[in-house]
Amino acid sequence: MTIPKTHPFPFDPTYGMTLDTLCAIVPPEAPPGFDAFWQKRYKRALTIDPQPALKQSNLTHPAWQVLDITYTSTDDVTIGGWLLLPRDAPVRRGLVVGHGYGGRDAPDFDLPVEQTAILFPCARGMSRSAQAPIPPDAPGHVLHNIDSPDDYVIGGCVEDLWIAVSTLQALYPWLANRIGYIGGSFGGGLGALAIPFDNRIDRGHLIVPTFGDRKQWLTLPTVGSADSVQTYQKTHPDVLDHLRLFDAATSATRIKVPMLVAVALFDPAVAPPCQFAVANAVPPLKYNEIFILDAGHFDYPGMTEQNFALREKLRGFLKLHEPGISALA
């Protein structure tokens, strides 16, 4: 392992924990009404007609046709993003790809998938989905309506992902039950909240997911989005009561589809105990796997090799359980 030994942070991004202690972390119990809260939101999201609109993008790629896309989400929010379609193969799979709290300025052309329509939505309030009065920056975004669970922006972002699935099915009806999800950091936490309540998503890949074990998330020092919420908590001590409904680890215990979760031993932006709370919460089914990274949100020796190994692991994961179909995503 090549866990970073030197860094510029005024705290230890390993939090003094070893792989063994991280793997022993258990998810928090669900607050009363957790399932009903999310089931109600999902039911509402299913009533939305996404009305996708497509146009040719200025971006080009030899393997992918690149389209700009917008669709309508809950609260009449317009979500913008990109849709990639294979140039020389049929569309037999769908994939929704989330993003980190830095937003997204372009699609990722290097995902190891084939015969797949890939939708890259921008979360409400960010990048192509900028929406006043939602702050576009991570410290402000994560606080938007935080004291009102029904209106908290994170719930809306989860709904945006569900409606991304609806959008793919509206465009390609034959993709029903053949749509996967990938998300890292912010997008990883959203995925853990979204996947268990949407049975149209057939598997997921989460990378260094945030929002796990909110009590710890509000306690451990960080340079990530939790920092602004920790500051807010000093004058609003009941914020944890609201955030327990948005705990990615609690939600992950309800996941029933194959999962590949990559978590880091060192991470200044998403504390490893919070990441492992999510990964450990995923039920230990046959095709579920945890992939260990030496670090997240930080460059380190061996990072290129580990990222390549994870990419190859993802390639295989996306092909599982698919006789006669070359890619699952």
Residues of each region from the PLM?
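N-terminal targeting or regulatory segments adjacent to alpha/beta-hydrolase or S9 domains
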Residues: M1-W64, S326-A329
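C-terminal catalytic histidine-bearing segment of alpha/beta-hydrolase fold enzymes
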Residues: K5, F276-A329
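Short beta-strand element of the alpha/beta-hydrolase
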Residues: G81-L85, P90-G102
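Cap/lid segment of the alpha/beta-hydrolase catalytic domain
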Residues: A106, D110, A117-E159, W217-L218
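Gly/Ser-rich "nucleophile elbow"/oxyanion-hole loop immediately N-terminal to the catalytic nucleophile
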Residues: V142-S185
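Hydrolase active-site cap/lid region
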Residues: L190-T235, G302
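Short beta-strand/loop motif that positions the catalytic acidic residue
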Residues: I255-K256, V261-V263
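Acidic catalytic loop of the alpha/beta-hydrolase fold
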Residues: L265-V270
